[in-house]
Design a protein with these regions (language model features):
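Ferredoxin-reductase
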Residues: 1-77
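Structural signal for conserved beta-strand scaffold positions within catalytic alpha/beta enzyme cores
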Residues: 6, 51, 158-160, 210, ...
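Hydrophobic beta-strand signal
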Residues: 35, 80-84, 227
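Short, surface-exposed secondary-structure boundary micro-motifs
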Residues: 39, 85-86, 231
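Short, Lys/Arg- and Gly-enriched loop/turn segments at beta-strand edges
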Residues: 42-49, 88-97, 238
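FNR/FR-type flavoprotein reductase catalytic core
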Residues: 71, 75-217
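Local cysteine-cluster metal-coordination motifs and their immediate loop/turn environment
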Residues: 116, 191, 213-243
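Short Fe-S-cluster ligation motifs
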Residues: 236-240, 244-281
C-alpha cells in the first residue's frame, strides 16, 4: 500500500493526488508516467507524472474523472494499492537538453495537458533553457496550475473557448501566427487537440512531439491495448512512447481505437458511481 498525503479537487472534474512512492520518483525524468491502482481489484490507471520530490519520495498526479477507474480514485483518502513507474520513455528534449539549448521551443497544453507539460518546462528551466507555452481550456476556471507554470516559463499565452481568459478560441488560433518563430513544438492534451496542432505545425514545417494517451492496461506492451500507428508501423505508447513524432501518427486510427469500448465504459462508470455512493452512505 502507498500512503496518500492528499487527494483534492482542483477544478470541476479534476483532482490532484500526492502519494509517497520513493522508488517511483528516484529515477523519473519528465515525460514518463505511472500506473496507479486505487484498490487491489481496481484497474490500472495510466497517469502522467505532474510533479515529484525526490528527497521526500513524493509523486504528484493531476487527473480528470473520465470513467469508472478515475471516479473510484477520486474517492481515495488514505492509501492506494499500487503505484508502478516510472514507465515509458522520457521527453526527448528533457533527456537531451544540451542539444536544444539554442533552439526555440514552444509547448502547447490543452486542458489537463498542463499537468504533464509543467514538469518538462520546469526541468528545462532548471537546466537553463527558455521555453514558451500556449495553454488552452474551455474556460478560465479550468486553466490548471497557472501560478506554478508562470514561474518557470519564458512567455505564456492563453486561449479559452469562451474568451473568459486570454484569446477567445483554441490553442491553434494562438499558435498559427507565431509557429514560424520556433524550432520545435511539444503538444500535450486531448487527442483531437494534438491532431489539430499537428495540422497547423505541418504547414509551417515545425517538428512536433505529441504525448499519446490511448487505452492502456498492463503498461508493459504485452496486451497491445495502447498500440499506435507511427509512420505506418505499430508502436506501443507504454514502452515506445508516450511521446512520438506528431506528423507520423495516424490520429484517425488512434481516435477510432479510443472509442472502441465507449458504451461499455459508460455502463461501468454508471455502476461505479452507484457503488461508491452506496459505500459513502
Amino acid at each position: 500500500m502507498y500512503k496518500v498525503l492528499y487527494n483534492k479537487k482542483v477544478t470541476s472534474g479534476s483532482y490532484e493526488i500526492a502519494i509517497e512512492a520513493p522508488l517511483v520518483v528516484k529515477k523519473v525524468i519528465p515525460g514518463q508516467f505511472a500506473l496507479v491502482m486505487a484498490k487491489e481489484d481496481s484497474e490500472r490507471i495510466p497517469l502522467s507524472i505532474y510533479d515529484y520530490d525526490q528527497e521526500k519520495g513524493i509523486v504528484y498526479f493531476i487527473y480528470q474523472v473520465v470513467g469508472a477507474s478515475t471516479e473510484e480514485l477520486s474517492y481515495v483518502k488514505d492509501e492506494v494499492f499500487g503505484v508502478v513507474g516510472p514507465l515509458g520513455q522520457p521527453n526527448e528534449i528533457c533527456k537531451n537538453f544540451e542539444d536544444f539549448k539554442n533552439k526555440k521551443i514552444v509547448y502547447v497544453a490543452g486542458g489537463v495537458g498542463m499537468a504533464p507539460v509543467y514538469p518538462q518546462v520546469k526541468y528545462l528551466h532548471d537546466h537553463g533553457l527558455k521555453v514558451d507555452v500556449i495553454a488552452g481550456a474551455r474556460s478560465a476556471d479550468l486553466l490548471l496550475i497557472r501560478d506554478k507554470m508562470e514561474k518557470v516559463v519564458n512567455k505564456i499565452r492563453y486561449a479559452t473557448d469562451d474568451g473568459s481568459f486570454g484569446t477567445k478560441g483554441f490553442v491553434t488560433d494562438v499558435l498559427d501566427p507565431i509557429a514560424d518563430d520556433y524550432d520545435i513544438c511539444v503538444a500535450i492534451g486531448p487527442m483531437i487537440m494534438m491532431k489539430t496542432v499537428c495540422d497547423v505545425t505541418k504547414k509551417h514545417n515545425l517538428k512536433t512531439i505529441v504525448s499519446m494517451n490511448p487505452l492502456m492496461v498492463d503498461g508493459s506492451g504485452m496486451c497491445g491495448a495502447c498500440r499506435c500507428e507511427v509512420d505506418g508501423k505499430p508502436k506501443f505508447a507504454c514502452i515506445h512512447g508516450p511521446e512520438f513524432d506528431g506528423h507520423k501518427i495516424d490520429f484517425s486510427l488512434a481516435m477510432q481505437r479510443m472509442n472502441t469500448y465507449k458504451e461499455e465504459e459508460k455502463e461501468k462508470w454508471d455502476q461505479m458511481k452507484k457503488r461508491l455512493e452506496k459505500e459513502k452512505k
